[in-house]
């Protein structure tokens, strides 16, 4: 995510900030510079020192709002696994959207633990948003079947063989299917 924080500043001839705009806020500011003082008599303003986390949050919140507005999207669907990545994404979008415009979808299979299923539901309850559970085991089995039934042909010899799908590969299919 790329965001431009705003926070434009005006410096005097000695490098002191004499005025600045607020970060992550569209702002047009007119500043009257007294040419007689050449900036040195101006009173430097304190620059807000935010935390790295607070600044990162502001940047992400601003970026999400601007991106959604730019593409005209008012509602979002997020697949939630019960893990940290989807939880952070859902929490960020939860600060930008009304709860009725955010749908979290849990897509369990045989590889999904009870703990992660429960965490996905708890996340949706905590955010007060829409929630759905759509099991994907049938889709995973279909994809595994497609892979294992598709012949692989050695173009030199004409020999045909089948691909075997190992259990850890099937688990990765589940994550991407």
Model regions: which residues?
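Generic secondary-structure signature for well-ordered alpha-helical cores
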Residues: 13-16, 20-23, 36, 61-69, ...
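C-terminal beta-strand edge segments of enzyme domains
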Residues: 1-61
